[in-house]
């Protein structure tokens, strides 16, 4: 390619960049105007239903060479910047920076959102309940290790609702200063340690696992331990300067963690929703079958059901159920009404747009 051809292409790119900036600023001005209207109406800037529509619409417009996923990533940052212009949005997440909850929050809200990392899952709930943050991001379940008990326990008592979900493919790295033969302790969150159990047994059989509040907290511990290592994300390695000596050490390559967005308010139906409920039944034979029968009769698909022991009540359980549909859908509303009559306790945790899990 001739030098002149390169310069012609660069001029073409600069011209399109200028036009893009003008259009983005035009869009931003409209977004600011929308923010004023929302504020006058008492509406929040976070609208997961509308954002889903925008991202789906943009992805459908793609004709290449940019993929639908690339377009979603670009517009996610545009939406993040637009929200920041309307009103600052504070999102609490399990931290410190570089944790998988921090990654999930970035994935959902973009880099223009003010993220507020917290030390524990409970602290995330507290930050939103006490209105120090507008929303929170906490892990709910992992495809390999199952539910996160701390999150389930807080959902029982919190006045907050589930406003959205984020499904994040989890890839673990071993971060350390020294060679593997010198590692005597491996720090990480209990779920991360469990997800890498087989790899650790094969490669670091002498190393003792040490539990921490988060994967990023594990990196901070390992930084001060010459014979220590941490299981964390590649982003955590970049943020804290601890080299990733091994990558992809999770036992199951399809390892996915589901996070939920917690906050006040409710979402309107989208036609592709999920509703989460928590309930307990009377302690008698057939009680669970009778409680779930209305959903089968209405043709409502149950996506997930987990039993959760009730503290201080031996052999009594709470059931966490995800079902297809929105709590305002007629069939779901009628089924929930029937469920309430057949249970000792029922709490609708929220209805929200259903995410597609990473393939």
What are the roles of these predicted feature ranges?
Residues 1-359:
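Domain-level signature for soluble enzymes in the chorismate/prephenate branch of the shikimate pathway
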């Amino acid at each position: 390619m001739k030098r002149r051809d390169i310069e012609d292409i660069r001029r073409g790119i600069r011209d399109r960049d200028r036009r893009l900036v003008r259009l983005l600023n035009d869009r931003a001005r409209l977004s600011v105007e929308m923010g004023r209207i929302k504020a006058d109406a008492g509406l929040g800037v976070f609208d997961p239903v509308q954002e889903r529509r925008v991202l789906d619409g943009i992805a459908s417009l793609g004709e290449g060479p940019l993929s639908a996923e690339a377009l979603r990533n670009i517009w996610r940052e545009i939406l993040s910047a637009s929200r920041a212009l309307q009103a600052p949005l504070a999102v609490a997440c399990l931290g410190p920076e570089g944790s998988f909850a921090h990654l999930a929050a970035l994935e959902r809200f973009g880099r223009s959102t003010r993220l507020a990392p917290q030390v524990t899952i409970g602290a995330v709930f507290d930050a939103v309940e006490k209105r120090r943050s507008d929303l929170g991001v906490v892990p709910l379940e992992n495809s390999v290790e199952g539910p996160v008990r701390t999150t389930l326990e807080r959902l029982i008592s919190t006045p907050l609702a589930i406003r959205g979900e984020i499904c994040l493919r989890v890839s673990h790295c071993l971060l350390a200063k020294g060679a593997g033969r010198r590692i005597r302790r491996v720090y990480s969150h209990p779920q991360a340690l469990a997800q890498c159990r087989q790899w650790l047994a094969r490669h670091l059989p002498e190393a003792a696992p040490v539990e921490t509040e988060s994967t990023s907290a594990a990196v901070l511990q390992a930084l001060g331990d010459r014979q220590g290592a941490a299981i964390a994300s590649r982003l955590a390695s970049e943020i804290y300067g601890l080299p990733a000596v091994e990558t992809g050490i999770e036992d199951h390559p399809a390892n996915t963690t589901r996070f939920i967005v917690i906050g006040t308010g409710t979402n309107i139906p989208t036609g592709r929703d999920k509703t989460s409920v928590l309930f307990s039944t009377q302690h008698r034979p057939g009680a669970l079958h009778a409680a779930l029968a209305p959903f089968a009769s209405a043709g409502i698909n149950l996506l997930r059901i987990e039993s959760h022991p009730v503290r201080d009540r031996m052999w009594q359980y709470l059931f966490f159920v995800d079902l297809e549909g929105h709590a305002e859908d007629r069939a779901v509303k009628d089924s929930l009404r029937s469920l309430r009559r057949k249970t000792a306790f029922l709490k609708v945790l929220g209805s929200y747009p259903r995410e597609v899990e990473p393939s």
